[in-house]
Amino acid sequence: MASSTPSPATSSNAGADPNTTNLRPTTYDTWCGVAHGCTRKLGLKICGFLQRTNSLEEKSRLVSAFRERQASKNLLSCENSDPGARFRRTETDFSNLFAQDLLPAKNGEEQTVQFLLEVVDILLNYVRKTFDRSTKVLDFHHPHQLLEGMEGFNLELSDHPESLEQILVDCRDTLKYGVRTGHPRFFNQLSTGLDIIGLAGEWLTSTANTNMFTYEIAPVFVLMEQITLKKMREIIGWSNKDGDGIFSPGGAISNMYSIMAARYKYFPEVKTKGMAAVPKLVLFTSEHSHYSIKKAGAALGFGTDNVILIKCNERGKIIPADLEAKILDAKQKGFVPLYVNATAGTTVYGAFDPIQEIADICEKYNLWLHVDAAWGGGLLMSRKHRHKLSGIERANSVTWNPHKMMGVLLQCSAILVKEKGILQGCNQMCAGYLFQPDKQYDVSYDTGDKAIQCGRHVDIFKFWLMWKAKGTVGFENQINKCLELAEYLYAKIKNREEFEMVFNGEPEHTNVCFWYIPQSLRGVPDSPERREKLHRVAPKIKALMMESGTTMVGYQPQGDKANFFRMVISNPAATQSDIDFLIEEIERLGQDL
């Protein structure tokens, strides 16, 4: 392959060693041509090899080996020698094809390719429209309309198989009548956005179709989870390298894990003997905390009456003095205080409880401190905002949902525990068909016995892939942007007569809570009658909003307050123009109320 005649570009370096990569002899250009003539993946391999290897003979040998290996790839390989023919769409009559005609059916390769190309086309069209602001957030229909069936779309299940043509119609219509939660004008929930890297990770996760209980069947995913959880514990600020954690089906289950861990830590006999073997235990949480704490109290046998609610100030933060008073009151009544939940980012107000002061009280009375940072945990990634979670490193356990502020696709929630071994001890049942101690690898990587589930979905890959793609700094920028948009919204409406803030001062999180005041109620003194009328405003606007499909934002009451809008921003695709649109849309829909 090599030429003995130097090219004009290299003639001035004729005395140099031609076997080094400091020069670009004609052979180098020849190899680059070979690389460019190959499929993309193979070409990248060759180019990477050219950058690393100095020997001309070795380069020639390896290029030939690559091409020989390439010739052995089958039809479905992404490295087929003809890039254009790999997955070329052809006219296919899906009305006469059924699931049984796809792989693993004999000669099912072509039908499988064509069917999946149609599905990918549906998916890509949906993704494109999701980021198109001229597309509606939703095409709203009432439940009875969908249950009765739309044209070509029927939810009822049949005894006999339907054609792939109908299956493709069902795929399109399912997305059509759903809500575009990735739309830049969807502000209804804490989990929003459509991250493309995360989407790719979720595709591949489903393709792998494995389970997280043992290293044996999910080796790479188990290691990814271990590495990611370790990184999250470091970000929390735990110096103990032997902490623990697991990904769970959501923040409610993560919070339940924290209560189970606390109970096992102080009363391990509960695992075998039940609640009858322990004293009358009580839990403490704020009146603004997530309802999952009370739900866990019910599910775990404490009873909701033994989940004691702590008063909050006007911003929705725990009042530490009330916490201590209620701990003392419980002790005086013969109860045993066990656990305190502090919230970092409440669901409605976005408030951050004073963790340092709560931690002092927990240390004083030897209580387990859990921080529910499902919503606010993402702020730990931001050097500008992580101070709002000051003291979180003193917690015994933390819930952190990357599927909220970090924009990871649902579901992705972690329960992190400072002390290693508690999750295992609490939940381990040593099922012999899964967790054999004499396997050929280190069985400490079999994490399934930490979980209350048996089968556990792979939630880690999309998150790990996003972290690789963005880096910690990318997440930081994304989170800072969302908080800046919340500040923009607050500044835009705080002094306008059409709007009234639910509480004074700038928001701590991206939660901006406000009332829209229609013309008929402006300047009207506060009274029960005015509050009753105001209570009906947000639901009416929300109903009109859903009918028009232009945007979505949530509303709710809080305590004795009338229904108000709770705006939350977690979608990095949102911009100031989307905030402006929301304000204008609320005014437009509410002008005649």
UniProtKB/Swiss-Prot annotation:
Region annotation Disordered: residue ranges?
1-22
Q: Which residues bind 4-aminobutanoate?
A: 189-191, 566
Classification via InterPro entries:
PyrdxlP-dep_de-COase, PyrdxlP-dep_Trfase, PyrdxlP-dep_Trfase_major, Pyridoxal-P_BS
Q: Which residues carry this modification: Phosphoserine?
A: 77
Q: What is its EC number?
A: 4.1.1.15
Q: Which reaction does it catalyse?
A: L-glutamate + H(+) = 4-aminobutanoate + CO2
Q: Which PROSITE patterns match?
A: DDC_GAD_HDC_YDC
Q: N6-(pyridoxal phosphate)lysine is carried by which residues? A: 404
Keywords attached to this entry: Decarboxylase, Lyase, Neurotransmitter biosynthesis, Phosphoprotein, Pyridoxal phosphate
A Gene Ontology biological process term: response to caloric restriction
Q: Which cofactors are named for this entry?
A: pyridoxal 5'-phosphate
Biased composition (Low complexity) is annotated at 1-12
Question: What SUPFAM superfamilies is this protein classified in?
Answer: PLP-dependent transferases
Q: In which tissues is it expressed?
A: Expressed in brain and pancreatic islets.
User: Which Cys pairs does UniProt list as disulfide-bonded?
Assistant: none
Q: Name one GO cellular component term.
A: inhibitory synapse
Q: How does it assemble?
A: Homodimer.
Role of this protein: Catalyzes the synthesis of the inhibitory neurotransmitter gamma-aminobutyric acid (GABA) with pyridoxal 5'-phosphate as cofactor.
Q: Of which family is this protein a member?
A: Belongs to the group II decarboxylase family.
PANTHER family reported for this sequence? GLUTAMATE DECARBOXYLASE 1, GLUTAMATE DECARBOXYLASE-RELATED
Q: What is the official name of this protein in its record?
A: Glutamate decarboxylase 1
Q: Which organism is it from?
A: Rattus norvegicus
